[in-house]
Amino acid sequence: MLILTRRVGETLMVGDDVTVTVLGVKGNQVRIGVNAPKEVSVHREEIYMRIQAEKGGQPGSAE
């Protein structure tokens, strides 16, 4: 896992088309903004897991 340090207002790039910007830090919560093309899905992990479960398969499980 790559670990990066960013301050509020700073951005990191994922490939050529996705940017992740730190919008704010309050206590133990970090607000981030993700700018990605329409064809790239962006979800919180718990939402992604729910979508996968509804599709009938858990990521990483042997089927």
From Swiss-Prot:
The alphabetical list of record keywords is: Activator, Cytoplasm, Repressor, RNA-binding, Translation regulation
Q: Which GO terms describe its cellular component?
A: cytosol
User: Could you tell me the Gene Ontology terms of the biological process aspect for this record?
Assistant: mRNA catabolic process; negative regulation of translational initiation; positive regulation of translational initiation; regulation of carbohydrate metabolic process
Q: Where in the cell is it found?
A: Cytoplasm
What does the protein in this record do?
A key translational regulator that binds mRNA to regulate translation initiation and/or mRNA stability. Mediates global changes in gene expression, shifting from rapid growth to stress survival by linking envelope stress, the stringent response and the catabolite repression systems. Usually binds in the 5'-UTR; binding at or near the Shine-Dalgarno sequence prevents ribosome-binding, repressing translation, binding elsewhere in the 5'-UTR can activate translation and/or stabilize the mRNA. Its function is antagonized by small RNA(s).
- How is the subunit organization of this protein annotated in UniProt? Homodimer; the beta-strands of each monomer intercalate to form a hydrophobic core, while the alpha-helices form wings that extend away from the core.
**Under what name is this protein listed?**
Translational regulator CsrA
